[in-house]
UniProtKB/Swiss-Prot annotation:
InterPro entries: Fork_head_dom, FOX_domain-containing, TF_fork_head_CS_1, TF_fork_head_CS_2, WH-like_DNA-bd_sf, WH_DNA-bd_sf
Protein name, per record: Forkhead box protein I3
Phenotype of null mutants: Embryonic lethality due to impaired pharyngeal arches segmentation. Embryos fail to form endodermal pouches and this results in failed pharyngeal arches segmentation leading to severe defects in the skull, jaw, and ears. Craniofacial neural crest cells undergo apoptosis in the mutant embryos at 10.0 day post coitum (dpc). Conditional deletion in epithelium leads to fusion of molars with abnormally patterned shallow cusps.
Tissue expression as described in the entry: Specifically expressed in the epithelium in developing ectodermal appendages. Expressed in pharyngeal endoderm and ectoderm. Expressed in pre-placodal ectoderm. Down-regulated as the otic placode is induced. Expressed in teeth and hair follicles throughout embryogenesis. Expressed in mammary glands only during the earliest stages of development.
Length: 399
């Protein structure tokens, strides 16, 4: 007894009688392997079309294959089993049911696929949204015109005719078309000529933006980094005196050549004579535009006046060793030097009020030799943390 697979798992085939001779299976003829008709050679399953509509093609694609010539059945197409066995009858894959309506091709088409029926390719396109933005649709419509300009109504017509998806719910996408025409800089409005009948302005595409529409996709140009950084750089037409005045913003530069030059002020080049004679110099404009530097200089001027009134004309740095918090510093760090009244390092600065005033740009913080302990400048280590806070304020403002 042979077992075969069917719809209900397994069914049996009754064995032949022991004495009966084995039946020979008739070979298939060439007509059984003939090619399907031309109507059934369509590779695309556009249903209800000529490829599946005919009875022969329907039988070959959807029904059971033709039985072999002869009385003996094929190995996988067995007759229904006898009642009482554990198997049921084998059925075709796409046999029409009794309640199904008759197909338009007739009763000879047993395998009509009604669950996949679609009217045409246009119905499928109505369900799928085109992969283009509204700006790309407008650009395609304008580029398809002979004069490269269209009115708003003609743009609507182009989109609806070429893309069936937009034939429904026109109010939504037409509003988006109007917004893109108004907000996108690539679309320019061209007024209608006086002799041109009709109403409404024309819309055209900016020639500089034609390369932004690559294969229907709108690609906005990104702003280059060089263009963005050029807006933040200083113009190249600034004078040399302004560049020199910007260098005067930092004072008291430490020089590491020798230990004796730690507190030596930075020597800045003197401005030209033409700049001195003018009432408003680039340095004055720099001081006016930097309030932090003005506060720094005015504080030093006040300290200079107080120190000169309390100490007189004695501006000497002691050479003896000082102890500060248990730390001993060598005497070579602060050499015994004398600073004249008119120091060459002092420079002429104009104040915010516009009055020219000679003020010392640097204060050596010298202590009195008479040993006056009441003076706030009696020690050369005078509160350098306060000076640092003046030069580099803690509020985060830039000098």
């Amino acid at each position: 007894m042979a077992l075969y697979c069917g719809d209900n798992f397994v069914y049996s085939q009754p064995a032949a009688a022991p004495g009966a001779p084995p039946t020979s299976r008739a070979p298939y003829g060439l007509s059984d392997y003939a090619a399907p008709p031309a109507a059934a050679a369509n590779p695309y399953l556009w249903l209800n079309g000529p490829g599946v509509g005919g009875p022969a093609s329907a039988a070959s694609y959807l029904g059971a294959p033709p039985p072999p010539p002869g009385a003996a059945p094929g190995p996988f197409l067995q007759p229904p089993a006898a009642p009482g066995t554990f198997a049921g009858a084998q059925r075709g894959f796409a046999q029409p049911s009794a309640s199904a309506p008759a197909s338009p091709a007739g009763s000879a088409a047993p395998g009509e696929l009604g669950w996949l029926s679609m009217a045409s390719r246009e119905d499928l396109m109505k369900m799928v949204r085109p992969p283009y933005s509204y700006s790309a649709l407008i650009a395609m419509a304008i580029q398809s015109a002979p004069e490269r300009k269209l009115t708003l109504s003609h743009i609507y017509q182009f989109v609806a005719d070429n893309f069936p998806f937009y034939q429904r719910s026109k109010a939504g996408w037409q509003n988006s078309i109007r917004h893109n025409l108004s907000l996108n800089d690539c679309f320019k409005k061209v007024p209608r000529d006086e002799d041109d009948p009709g109403k409404g302005n024309y819309w055209t595409l900016d020639p500089n933006c034609e390369k932004m529409f690559d294969n229907g996709n709108f690609r906005r140009k990104r702003r280059r980094r060089a263009e963005a950084s050029s807006n933040l750089t200083v113009p190249s037409g600034t004078s040399k005196s302004e560049g020199q005045s910007s260098r005067l913003r930092v004072s008291g530069k430490l020089e590491g050549d020798s230990p004796s030059s730690i507190l030596r002020p930075s020597q800045s080049p003197e401005p030209p004579e033409g700049t001195k004679s003018t009432a408003s110099s680039p340095g004055a404009s720099t001081l006016t535009s930097t309030p932090c530097l003005n506060t720094f200089l005015s504080t030093f001027n006040t300290l200079n006046v107080n120190s000169s009134s309390s100490m007189g004309n004695q501006r000497t740095l002691p050479g003896s060793r000082r102890h500060l918090g248990g730390t001993q510093l060598p005497s070579s760090t602060f050499p015994n030097t004398s600073v004249p009244d008119s120091s060459p390092d002092s420079m002429q600065l104009s104040t915010v009020g516009g009055s020219n005033q000679l003020s010392s740009y640097y204060n050596p913080f010298s202590g009195g030799s008479s040993g006056d302990q009441s003076s706030p400048f009696s020690s050369p280590f005078y509160n350098f943390s306060m000076v640092n806070s003046l030069i580099y304020p803690r509020d985060g403002s830039d000098i």
